[in-house]
C-alpha cells in the first residue's frame, strides 16, 4: 500500500492512499500528486534507504512526501 502525505502546519496531512492494482485509487493519487506539484510543492520518495526528488508519482513506493521548497536568507 502506498501513501501520499503533505507536510504542513499540522505536521502532515494524508492526501491519498492506494494499493497495487486498484486503478481508481492510483488515478486519484496521481491526480492529487500532480495538482500539488502545480501548487509548487516538491515530491520525494525513499527507495533503498535514500530519498530522491520525484516528478511523477512512483506507484511502487510505500511513502511519498510533498513539501514546500526550502527558502532561506
Predicted regions and their residues:
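Ubiquitin-like/PB1-type beta-grasp interaction modules and other compact soluble beta-rich domains
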Residues: 1-71
Amino acid at each position: 500500500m502506498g501513501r501520499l502525505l503533505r507536510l504542513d502546519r499540522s505536521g502532515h496531512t494524508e492526501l491519498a492512499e492506494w494499493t497495487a492494482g486498484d486503478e481508481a485509487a492510483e488515478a486519484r493519487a496521481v491526480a492529487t500528486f500532480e495538482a500539488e506539484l502545480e501548487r509548487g510543492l516538491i515530491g520525494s520518495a525513499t527507495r533503498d534507504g535514500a530519498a530522491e526528488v520525484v516528478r511523477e508519482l512512483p506507484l511502487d513506493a510505500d511513502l511519498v512526501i510533498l513539501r514546500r521548497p526550502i527558502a532561506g536568507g
